[in-house]
Amino acid sequence: PRFEDVPAAVEKRIVEDVENVFYPTKPVVPFLDIVHDRAVLELFRGCTRGCRFCQAGMLYRPVREKTPERLLQIAKDTIANTGYNEISLMSLSSADYSKLPELVDMLMEEFKDKQVSVSLPSLRIDSFSIDIAKKVQQVRKSGLTFAPEAGTQRMRDVINKGVSEEDLLAACTNAFKSGWNTVKLYFMMGLPTETDEDLAGIADLAYKVLDLHRDITGKRNGSVTVSVSFFVPKTHSPYQWYGQQDVEEIHRKQRYLKSLINNRNISYHYHDGYTGYMEAAFARGDRRLSKVLVKAWEAGCKFDGWTEFFNYETWLKAFADCGLDPAYFARRTRDFDEPLPWDHLDCTVSKAFLKREWEQAVDANLTSDCRRGPCKGCNVCPELNTAIIDYKEGGRVEKVTFGLK
């Protein structure tokens, strides 16, 4: 620290009682259309599924749920104040909310005569409920989105996704039998230990889902959208030490996967490799990159999250003008003992736990969810003197865990 009154490490703070925390039920409603033009209902905070690529799953631990009654009141107030006609149930893994069936019933009953729909984000395959999906589609029908994340079981185990091909096909079977014809699948490319066989598994899964629709319905009007993002290693996650793959290699993989998908009923979308490269540089960068941001802005970089505004050469020049190389931050695999630029930001998940998870990933071993199972020793609960709050057994359950340094 540069000043005596500044602590060496800044520890995160959390809201222990999410039930009674302030919630913005009177948001500003713009006159023009925006991306998330709907009411948002936060079911709970935190996620302990333990996906190794996920920064948010580490940062926002532990899980703390709200009651259905509190959520219903928030929804009623927000709709009354905004006039929105859609409520999105948002959390890191919304389908894991212990009282989701009860909440959906309450929302549908409350808004059945007001043409207010309820929507769910992309769903975990292993917590998907066709009954809930059918209920939320009563007002406004849409496609279903699942997130297998990887094409082979080995790769899904590496990232600790904890779902199988059988889980995906079972979920799609239920969906197709219930009248859905469209499914969207989310994947990532460039993950640690990934091979071309794992990429081929993405195409293979897409074809299996499409064939499943034809077998169940006897029709050829099914469609599958395959959306593949470029993996960006994030701080405070087990992959914070991992160097991102070269952009040229990612482009090769994108072409390879595209060559395997030759069906008009399968749409293939992928993210720009150069944008992902810049994201990785800033995701694992240090304070020197603040000068790069200023240089890029002075050179005209604005709204660069949109590909039509993104100018890769301008960003490279901004780095060069500051005497820096983005590859140093994005592509370099760091040593376990190396001090990290973000070590002074303490999210209370111990570095020892993240190292163990990296080692588990290399061996393709799964780590189970501590939400309703044994503690995995991430250190969050004892460090913050807090507990997991879950309503699965009916009433409020506060599960206290321990830490392993």
Task: Label each PLM-derived region with a short phrase.
Residues P1-A56, R61-V63, E69, G305-L345, ...:
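Acidic, low-complexity intrinsically disordered segments
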Residues K26-V28, R45-R49, M58-R61, T78, ...:
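Short, glycine-/Ser/Thr-/acidic-enriched flexible segments
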Residues H36-V40, R52-P62, Y84-L92, G151-V158, ...:
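Glycine- and acidic
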Residues C54, R334-L404:
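Cysteine-cluster motifs in flexible loop/terminal segments that predominantly coordinate metals
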